[in-house]
Swiss-Prot record:
Entry-linked InterPro entries: Asp/Glu-ADT_sf_sub_c, GatC
Keyword list, A-Z: ATP-binding, Ligase, Nucleotide-binding, Protein biosynthesis
GO biological process, one term: regulation of translational fidelity
Role this protein plays: Allows the formation of correctly charged Asn-tRNA(Asn) or Gln-tRNA(Gln) through the transamidation of misacylated Asp-tRNA(Asn) or Glu-tRNA(Gln) in organisms which lack either or both of asparaginyl-tRNA or glutaminyl-tRNA synthetases. The reaction takes place in the presence of glutamine and ATP through an activated phospho-Asp-tRNA(Asn) or phospho-Glu-tRNA(Gln).
Subunit structure: Heterotrimer of A, B and C subunits.
Gene encoding the protein: gatC
Organism: Pseudarthrobacter chlorophenolicus (strain ATCC 700700 / DSM 12829 / CIP 107037 / JCM 12360 / KCTC 9906 / NCIMB 13794 / A6)
Chain intervals for the UniProt region annotation (Disordered): 75-98
Protein family membership: Belongs to the GatC family.
Protein name: Aspartyl/glutamyl-tRNA(Asn/Gln) amidotransferase subunit C
Coiled coil: none
Enzyme Commission numbers on file: 6.3.5.-
GO terms assigned for molecular function: asparaginyl-tRNA synthase (glutamine-hydrolyzing) activity; ATP binding; glutaminyl-tRNA synthase (glutamine-hydrolyzing) activity
Length: 98
């Protein structure tokens, strides 16, 4: 990976329409060089034998059997509803679709 120099930073600043002083260009070039070196060292650390992961700790789902327990009848569920229609909760329309 090529090093980031002052000219690269000046070019990026022009593309982003950011005005930078000579001192800022020098400081940013140094900071970006450190970042590039850090990314390079991380890239070298992960070999081909290391599988790609999305999370550092293995995640497993805990499944349980889906057992139907005590349920309400439609009438019981709708007993406290302000409005219902055909055994369904009736709510005000929020979209202008029929």
């Amino acid at each position: 990976m090529a090093a980031i120099n002052r000219d690269d930073v000046a070019h990026l600043a022009r593309l982003a329409h950011i005005e930078m002083s000579a001192q800022e260009l020098d400081r940013m070039a140094g900071e970006l060089a450190v970042i590039v070196d850090s990314v390079k060292s991380v890239s070298e650390a992960a070999g081909d034998d290391v599988p790609a992961t999305s999370h550092p700790i293995p995640l497993t789902n805990v499944f349980r059997e889906d057992v139907v327990g005590h349920t309400f009848s439609a009438e019981q569920a709708l007993s406290g509803a302000p409005d219902s229609d055909d055994n369904r909760f009736k709510v005000p329309a929020i979209l202008d679709e029929a």
